[in-house]
């Protein structure tokens, strides 16, 4: 039988906006043999169910914390266009509608949690497929 795990991340300030509803939806609609691995930061959410496993992303990924600390003051790594000495560079030809403008789409620090969560899941969860939601 093919096995599947679902993973997701969310910041603490998005719990009420969408994360809680997403986890409740998983519990209600997904098959019992599909576990959701919810990578969180800060305080672990209090929604408890056998189909949900919480993972503190900063605890299991010290490299994520180092990356965020290293790039937190780098405008380009945070989706802006102003470059600083020793910082990340963005190809001026990159992008289409946001070429030469700041955009959340280029925010490597904000979205780094997702990359580190996928990496951790692929290395530690013993299933055939890992699905990102």
Q: What are these language model-derived features?
A:
Residues 1-102, 109, 113, 123-126:
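N-terminal anchoring/stem segment of glycosyltransferases
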Residues 115-133:
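GT-A fold catalytic core of metal-dependent nucleotide-sugar glycosyltransferases
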């Amino acid at each position: 039988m093919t096995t599947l795990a679902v993973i997701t991340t969310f910041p603490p300030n998005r719990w009420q906006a969408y994360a809680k509803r997403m986890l409740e939806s998983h519990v209600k609609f997904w098959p019992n043999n599909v576990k959701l691995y919810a990578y969180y930061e800060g305080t672990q959410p209090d929604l408890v169910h056998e189909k949900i496993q919480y993972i503190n992303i900063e605890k299991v990924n010290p490299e994520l914390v180092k990356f965020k600390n290293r790039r937190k003051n780098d405008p380009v790594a945070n989706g802006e266009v102003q470059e600083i000495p020793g910082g990340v560079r963005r190809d001026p030809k990159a992008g289409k509608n946001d070429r030469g403008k700041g955009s959340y789409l280029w925010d490597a620090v904000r979205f780094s949690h997702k990359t580190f969560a996928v990496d951790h899941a692929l290395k530690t969860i013993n299933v055939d497929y890992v699905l990102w939601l």
